From Swiss-Prot:
The chain crosses the membrane at residues 3-23. Disulfide bonds: none annotated. PSII is composed of 1 copy each of membrane proteins PsbA, PsbB, PsbC, PsbD, PsbE, PsbF, PsbH, PsbI, PsbJ, PsbK, PsbL, PsbM, PsbT, PsbX, PsbY, PsbZ, Psb30/Ycf12, peripheral proteins PsbO, CyanoQ (PsbQ), PsbU, PsbV and a large number of cofactors. It forms dimeric complexes. SUPFAM superfamilies: Photosystem II reaction center protein T, PsbT. Coiled coil: none annotated. Its main location: membrane. It is found in: Cellular thylakoid membrane. Belongs to the PsbT family. One of its GO terms (biological process) is photosynthesis. This is Photosystem II reaction center protein T. The gene is psbT.
Length: 31
């Protein structure tokens, strides 16, 4: 189950980076 935990941590890291970039830049898509 180490691989599952590694994938989970990697996904969390990518999501944190994605949200950091998304909130840093102004929203280009207005709904």
């Amino acid at each position: 189950m180490e691989s599952v935990a590694y994938i989970l941590v990697l996904t969390m890291a990518l999501s944190v980076i994605f949200f950091a970039i998304a909130f840093r830049e102004p929203p280009r898509i207005q709904k």
